[in-house]
């Protein structure tokens, strides 16, 4: 009973971080199952496993997207790593609002329940994660499925807003003595920028889906031309949230990768301040490019020219980060342990995803490529290999600190190589399919596309084998069997530890710091 009370009512940032990780893992497995069903359907031309039910196919697409974005990447990145390590990294005893932290987590399971029930009610919600009207309107989706999905989004949105308020307050007000803003570890900076993005973008989404809800149920016509509304207004509102959202998913990953590259190159991060201002620039510019998702809806030519240029400008701070990671590794004494493998894999694959993004930024090219598999390949290279590789990298980097036990290195490396091979085999052929004109969200296709689709589906099965390997690693590491106890600082940085988590025991005590640490200087800015 006391154990149950501890986990239900916990206000400890480490306990809540662990809950987020468990929740993210469960949602991630479910989302992966949906993605495998999608790839099984697309393995060959014609109807395969769904019996020609095209609505069901789109329900799978929608559920896969929502699960992966709102219930896997965000809870694990921001809720898991953020809760676990932000207070430790800044020398704080806990988060600023511990009970708010608790409710932020416990809003997510009901939200997940609502999402899953939306897939089971009537014919499900087959709108895609964008939930565009008129497809999501009451005439096209007459049951309660879309309403349930909207309520699910509302709940997870409230959870994220409360969490971001908590992170902003914690980072601004609870830094230990001597921890100035310019001494903050890059992961903390990444969470801070992410929290601001959430705080500014989610209310816009909430407004859009609330208007959609009233259009569906109370006869308003916000998005219905018959009553003077405009479905394009919904697209503007959604993407004003949706584009910052993709940076919300990747920015904490940037912070994690910076720590790992620095640790395993035995060097401080190249251009610390440049890295910080690059993240802030990405955050600001992320709000100024939303209509590049809408080049095909009839925007004015000048508008398209602006959004093309603004989208390309985002590549500049992103490039600064990529080249700073490479410069950090340059001349370093690099150790290719599992976290570093995932970090290098991240840099390579994220760069490919970024380059295809530059292609899609051109409004003329995007008109040809919009809603084809080229776009699917692009954002999966950025997310399925960017955000997810950063998650795995962070797990292997900090797992000793979390569990207090070392992970099996060989199994970790096997996990990396299987996953690396699997995801590339899944998503690289999609570029060719997109360039050949294969449209997204359609469960059948002409025979001409059969070869690349078969290869892509085979790659997804390999990825599943890699994910199974990962859970084997988790099981071995968390059990008190053969693997040895983890040192305070497992990566041999004890001579010159750069961040505070390597100065506390593994796992940290329930109350991390007996007394608050005082920061005299950091490697980032040793002249302070």
Curated annotation (Swiss-Prot):
Its cofactor is heme; Cu cation. Keywords: Calcium, Copper, Electron transport, Heme, Iron, Magnesium, Membrane, Metal-binding, Mitochondrion, Mitochondrion inner membrane, Respiratory chain, Translocase, Transmembrane, Transmembrane helix, Transport. It is an enzyme of class 7 (translocase). Binds 2 heme A groups non-covalently per subunit. Binds a copper B center. It is found in: Mitochondrion inner membrane. It is a multi-pass membrane protein. Fe(II)-heme a binds at residues 64, 380. Mg(2+) binds at residues 370-371. SUPFAM superfamilies: Cytochrome c oxidase subunit I-like. GO terms for cellular component: mitochondrial inner membrane; respiratory chain complex IV. The chain crosses the membrane at residues 18-38, 66-86, 103-123, 148-168, 186-206, 237-257, 269-289, 312-332, 340-360, 379-399, 414-434, 447-467. GO terms for molecular function: cytochrome-c oxidase activity; heme binding; metal ion binding. One of its GO terms (biological process) is electron transport coupled proton transport. There is a cross-link at residues 243-247 (1'-histidyl-3'-tyrosine (His-Tyr)). Heme a3 binds at residue 378. InterPro entries: Cyt_c_oxase-like_su1_dom, Cyt_c_oxase-like_su1_sf, Cyt_C_Oxase_1, Cyt_c_Oxase_su1_BS, Cyt_c_oxase_su1_dom, Cyt_c_oxidase_su1_bac. The keyword tRNA-binding does not apply. The keyword Transmembrane applies. It catalyses: 4 Fe(II)-[cytochrome c] + O2 + 8 H(+)(in) = 4 Fe(III)-[cytochrome c] + 2 H2O + 4 H(+)(out). O2 binds at residue 247. Belongs to the heme-copper respiratory oxidase family. Component of the cytochrome c oxidase (complex IV, CIV), a multisubunit enzyme composed of a catalytic core of 3 subunits and several supernumerary subunits. The complex exists as a monomer or a dimer and forms supercomplexes (SCs) in the inner mitochondrial membrane with ubiquinol-cytochrome c oxidoreductase (cytochrome b-c1 complex, complex III, CIII). Component of the cytochrome c oxidase, the last enzyme in the mitochondrial electron transport chain which drives oxidative phosphorylation. The respiratory chain contains 3 multisubunit complexes succinate dehydrogenase (complex II, CII), ubiquinol-cytochrome c oxidoreductase (cytochrome b-c1 complex, complex III, CIII) and cytochrome c oxidase (complex IV, CIV), that cooperate to transfer electrons derived from NADH and succinate to molecular oxygen, creating an electrochemical gradient over the inner membrane that drives transmembrane transport and the ATP synthase. This is Cytochrome c oxidase subunit 1.
């Amino acid at each position: 009973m006391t154990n149950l009370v501890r986990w239900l009512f916990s206000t400890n940032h480490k306990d809540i971080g662990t809950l987020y990780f468990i929740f993210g893992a469960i949602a991630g497995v479910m989302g992966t199952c949906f993605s495998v069903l999608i790839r099984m359907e697309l393995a060959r031309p014609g109807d395969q496993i769904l019996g020609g039910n095209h609505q069901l196919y789109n329900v799978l697409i929608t559920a896969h997207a929502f699960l992966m974005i709102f219930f896997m990447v965000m809870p694990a990145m921001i809720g898991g790593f953020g809760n676990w390590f932000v207070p430790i990294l800044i020398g704080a005893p806990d988060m600023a609002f511990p009970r708010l932290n608790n409710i932020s987590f416990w809003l997510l399971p009901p939200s997940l329940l609502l999402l899953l029930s939306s897939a089971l009610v009537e014919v499900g919600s087959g709108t895609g994660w964008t939930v565009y009207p008129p497809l999501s309107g009451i005439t096209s989706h007459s049951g309660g499925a879309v309403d349930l999905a909207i309520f699910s989004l509302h709940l997870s949105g409230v959870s994220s807003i409360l969490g971001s308020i908590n992170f902003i307050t914690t980072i601004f007000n609870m830094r230990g003595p001597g921890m100035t803003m310019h001494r903050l570890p890059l992961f903390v900076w990444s969470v801070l920028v992410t929290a601001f993005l959430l705080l500014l973008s989610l209310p816009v989404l909430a407004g859009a889906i609330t208007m959609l809800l009233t259009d569906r149920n109370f006869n308003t016509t916000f998005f219905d031309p018959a009553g003077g509304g405009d479905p394009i207004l919904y697209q503007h509102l959604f993407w004003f949230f949706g584009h910052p959202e993709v940076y919300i998913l990747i920015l904490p990953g940037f912070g994690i990768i910076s720590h790992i590259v620095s640790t395993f190159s035995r060097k401080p991060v190249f251009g610390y301040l440049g890295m910080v201002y690059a993240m802030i620039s990405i955050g600001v510019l992320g709000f100024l490019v939303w209509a590049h998702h809408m080049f095909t809806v009839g925007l004015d030519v000048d508008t398209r020219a602006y959004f093309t240029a603004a989208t390309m400008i985002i590549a500049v701070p992103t490039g600064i980060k990529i080249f700073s990671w490479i410069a950090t590794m340059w001349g370093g004494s690099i150790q290719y342990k599992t976290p570093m493998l995932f970090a290098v894999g991240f840099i390579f694959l994220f760069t490919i995803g970024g380059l295809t993004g530059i292609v899609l930024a051109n409004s003329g090219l995007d008109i040809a490529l919009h809603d084809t598999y080229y776009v699917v390949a692009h954002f999966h290279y950025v997310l399925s290999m960017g955000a997810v590789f950063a998650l795995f990298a962070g797990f292997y980097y900090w797992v000793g600190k979390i569990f207090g036990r070392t992970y099996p290195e060989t199994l970790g490396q096997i996990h990396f190589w299987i996953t690396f091979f699997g995801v590339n085999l899944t998503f690289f052929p999609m570029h060719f399919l997109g360039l050949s004109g294969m449209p997204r969200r359609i469960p059948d296709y002409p025979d001409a596309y059969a070869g690349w689709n078969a290869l892509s589906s085979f790659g997804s099965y390999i990825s599943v084998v890699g994910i199974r390997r990962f859970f084997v690693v988790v099981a071995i590491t968390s059990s008190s069997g053969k693997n040895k106890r983890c040192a305070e600082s497992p990566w041999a940085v004890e001579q010159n530890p750069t961040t505070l988590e390597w100065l506390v025991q593994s796992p940290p005590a329930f109350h991390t710091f007996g007394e608050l640490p005082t920061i005299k200087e950091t490697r980032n800015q040793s002249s302070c």
